């Protein structure tokens, strides 16, 4: 970071590196992956396990551990629950709750690690595929090894109400958190 420190007037004037007190406003970002899958999974669990009581917690865990092998009926039930990206208030609210929880937690860590701000970046790149390959099955119906949703987009194939519904879902989370 010495080279980067040379690019900041504060560091140059104080003769200190960025992380040695040279910069006036030090901030950071944290890239997150799987937010949509997490929200869709929590929506499915809430609906099927707790509200409708169609699947027990033990049945769900068994199906997830088996990567849905021998549990296709459960997988299809999970897939059919409301998903983010369709302008569905319950699914979109779950994503908002996940997003706010992650953002608030990360923001609260700023002081602990000596930053003036610490923000979440919901990233869009090919890492969703890599992360999916390294992640076991999820309660949204995604099998182990399948790609996760890319950034703040719906999971592949789950946005079935068209582009306007997707855009309506996309703008619901606050960009100011």
Locate the predicted segments by residue.
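Acidic, glycine-enriched catalytic cores built around paired aspartates
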Residues: 1-177
